[in-house]
Amino acid sequence: MLRRSLIFLVLLSAGCVSLDPHYSTPESPIPATLPGAQGQGKAISHDWQQVIHDPRLQQVVTIALNSNRDVQKAIADIDSARALYGQTNASLFPTVNAALSSTRSRSLANGTGTTAEADGTVSSYTLDLFGRNQSLSRAARETWLASEFTAQNTRLTLIAEISTAWLTLAADNSNLALAKETMASAENSLKIIQRQQQVGTAAATDVSEAMSVYQQARASVASYQTQVMQDKNALNLLAGTTLAENLLPGTLESLPEQMISLVPAGVSSDVLLRRPDIQEAEHNLKSANADIGAARANFFPTISLTASAGVGSDALSSLFSHGMQIWSFAPSVTLPLFTGGSNLAQLRYAEAQKRGLIATYEKTVQSAFKDVANALARRTTLEEQLDAQRQYVKAEQQTVDVGLRRYQAGVGDYLTVLTAERSLWSAQQELLALQLTDFTNRITLWQSLGGGMSSLK
C-alpha cells in the first residue's frame, strides 16, 4: 500500500503547475547579414580536421585536446555541474529509508521489560504543487548544459591558440633563417668594403654603414633565436606536454597556402548562434528563468508527507517471526506568513539576475558579430596586400641585383647596394608577417563562425 501511495504522490507532483516565466530567446541585436561575406545562405560547419590539413599540426591539436589543463578543468566542471543536477533532481522523488530500533525500559512495580520495533520503510516527500523543485531541477540542468558549452568553447579556443602558436613558430623560424642569411651577406659586404678602404677606394663612412647593417643583422639573429625558444615554450604549455621535434614546423614558406582552409562565411548572421559561447550564455539565461519560478513558489504553502510501515515486537528475538504490523502517516503544511522580506528579496534577486544575463547574452552576440566582421574585413584586403608585397619584394631584389652589377662594372658605389639590401630585408620581413596574418586570419574566421563541433564533444 505504501508503495502505491508513493507512486501516486510522484504522479501528482508531476502534474503540478510551473511558475517559471515564459521563456523566449532574446532577439539578436545585430544586422541580419554579415558585412563583406561571400556566397549564399548559411555557412557550413567545418570540423577542425577538415580545416587543418598539416598532419603534424593535426597531431599537435589532438595532443593538446587530451592534455591541456584548461580543457581538463572544463571537463571537471561538467562533471561537477552534472552531479549537482543529479542532486537537485533527487528532490523530485520520495526518500525511502530502512530503520531498526530497539528500546529498553524498567518498571519499579513489575520489573524490567524490553520492547523492540523495526520500521521496514520510512518515507518523506514534499509535494511539489507549485513547481519549486521542478524549477530548481530545470535551473540545475541548464547550468549543466551551459558547462558543456563552456568546455566546447575552451576546446575551440585552444585549437585556435595552438594553431596560431604553431604557425608563429614557423614564421619566427623563417625570420631567423632570413636574419642569418642577411648577417652572412652583410659580413661579406663588410669585408669587401674594409679591403677597399685599405687601398683607398672606399670611405670610412662606407665601412660604418656596412658595419651598421652587419650588427643589425647580428642582433636580429640573437633576438629571433630567443623568440623561437619562447615560441616552443608557449606551444608546450598549450599542448600540456613537451612536443617532439618532428611535430614542430619548419619555415613558414615551406607550408602550402591551403594548409589552412578558408571557411566560407555565408551571408546570414544566424550562423553565429551556433557558437558555443552564445549557447552557453543562453543556457545560463534559461537557468536564471527557472530560478525565478523557484523564487515565486516560495510564496506558497509547502506540503510535506512522512510515512512509515513495518513490523514491531515486544522482544527483539521474535521481531522477524511473529511481530505486529505497524504504520504511521504524518502530513504537514508550512505556510510562509512572515519571512522578513526574504522571499521577496529572493524573487527580486532572481529577476535582476535574469536581466543581467539577458544583457550578457546580447553582448555575447554582439561580440561574436564583431569578431566575424573584423575577420571578414581583414580578409577583403589581405589577398591584395599579399600580392602587392610579393611584387615589392621582387622589385627590391631587382634593385639589389642592379646595384651589384653597377658596382662590379665600376659605375656605382657599394653604399647603394647596402641600402638596397637593407630595404630588401625589411620587405621580406613584412611579407612573412603578411603570410602569417593570412594563416591566422583563416583560423580566426573559422573560430569566430563557431568552428566545427563534431570532434569537440
Question: Model features per residue range: what roles?
Answer:
Residues 17, 133, 149-267, 378, ...:
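Periplasmic alpha-helical coiled-coil/stalk elements that build and connect Gram-negative outer-membrane
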Residues 187-188, 216-246, 295, 382, ...:
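Short segments within alpha-helical structural elements
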Residues 57-59, 115-117, 164, 209, ...:
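Transmembrane beta-barrel architecture of outer-membrane proteins
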Residues 61, 117-121, 166, 268, ...:
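Membrane-embedded beta-strand positions in outer-membrane beta-barrel channels/transporters
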